[in-house]
UniProtKB/Swiss-Prot annotation:
GO biological process assignments: actin cytoskeleton organization; actin filament polymerization; actin polymerization or depolymerization; cell division; dendritic spine morphogenesis; negative regulation of lymphocyte migration; negative regulation of membrane tubulation; positive regulation of clathrin-dependent endocytosis
Classification lineage: Eukaryota, Metazoa, Chordata, Craniata, Vertebrata
Name the UniProt record assigns to this protein: Actin nucleation-promoting factor WASL
Encoding gene, per UniProt annotation: WASL
UniProt keywords, alphabetically: Acetylation, Actin-binding, Cell cycle, Cell division, Cytoplasm, Cytoskeleton, Methylation, Mitosis, Nucleus, Phosphoprotein, Repeat, Transcription, Transcription regulation
Species annotation: Homo sapiens
PTMs per UniProt: Phosphorylation at Ser-242, Tyr-256, Ser-484 and Ser-485 enhances actin polymerization activity.
Amino acid sequence: MSSVQQQPPPPRRVTNVGSLLLTPQENESLFTFLGKKCVTMSSAVVQLYAADRNCMWSKKCSGVACLVKDNPQRSYFLRIFDIKDGKLLWEQELYNNFVYNSPRGYFHTFAGDTCQVALNFANEEEAKKFRKAVTDLLGRRQRKSEKRRDPPNGPNLPMATVDIKNPEITTNRFYGPQVNNISHTKEKKKGKAKKKRLTKADIGTPSNFQHIGHVGWDPNTGFDLNNLDPELKNLFDMCGISEAQLKDRETSKVIYDFIEKTGGVEAVKNELRRQAPPPPPPSRGGPPPPPPPPHNSGPPPPPARGRGAPPPPPSRAPTAAPPPPPPSRPSVAVPPPPPNRMYPPPPPALPSSAPSGPPPPPPSVLGVGPVAPPPPPPPPPPPGPPPPPGLPSDGDHQVPTTAGNKAALLDQIREGAQLKKVEQNSRPVSCSGRDALLDQIRQGIQLKSVADGQESTPPTPAPTSGIVGALMEVMQKRSKAIHSSDEDEDEDDEEDFEDDDEWED
């Protein structure tokens, strides 16, 4: 008997049915227009009419009407194709409670989505077969829906209501005297004897049981997007799950099963809260970010350091606080040299901004500007590198010509490799936050080097870890299973589709 029961599925497989008025080649072309996993259960040459507001029939198009079983959408459609151009002209889904009328043998009507629709058949034999295919399908769907609504155990039985009272909790049982305990236990036994014991006969059978969880998932319609929990929606967005997947019956069931296996909605939400990343730190460096803006807001050259305009620093040169603008202080021998020794690498930048008589000192100032605000401890530059010491000390008196300045600047640039040998320990300790920040910027060697691999690694573990990664893996397996199906699996899907026709409520 078991082998006999397993044989019914093969007859359920639907094959394409062509039109009697078309040639075999035209029918084959029609079948290719249906699409993947789509089968026409009946085909006929028709004219499509629609009723306008004046209740008059107006012709819309003509072509081949097909009763299409669309497996991907798990639904049935009436579609009209143009076999010459190979395109779809019109379609109407067979919705719930669809009514198909035939006032004439060749003229069939039904209610469309927007208006009353009619099919005018070119051949009455085709019209008869087409009507039979549609009515048989509607009858089968109606029987299945009624079968699902009726409970398997016959009529509904009223549920017996039983009042179960919780036993009273008294402290005498533990702390009272023995006499009270004995009397209390006797009264308790009498009370128990009076109560009627609950039996299976007193419990009614469940009826119209439907599992509607607070997840917002329904076996037939998928997830309810309007009432979906915000935290679950955030999880689905993180996993890249679309609304169409949440509404799909099979895909939504996979997601729902995953949530149940994980421990339910509350467990998933707790896991999400636990895995939520902490707020990012305000900044990576030690010095606060505010100091840089005021420093940059001052005059363009760093020497100003935001304390005042460029002109005042020259007058304050003897204080050694802002020695940067040495152009005005070339006569003073001590302040200019320290700037030269401190950081001459950036000289090329400032000479362009200060093309006055002594361009060499400004470049050196650019490098030292904020670094040497305290006293300039370093002694005058050694005579080793001729360009640097000569330029600041004798720049105003001995190098009036621009050609000499340019040559000195080039010499200083060439000797830049020697100037980089200044040890970091010899620099004065800066006391202000701004100076410390500038020190850190100039001392690029101390900055932590970040490898290229580290940049790409942080983002990867986050999305693929925990509950998010597990759900993404489930969805990837689901996607692979859908895209890797072959023709044999398609036929199995059709059988399941017939057995599991669940697109209606």
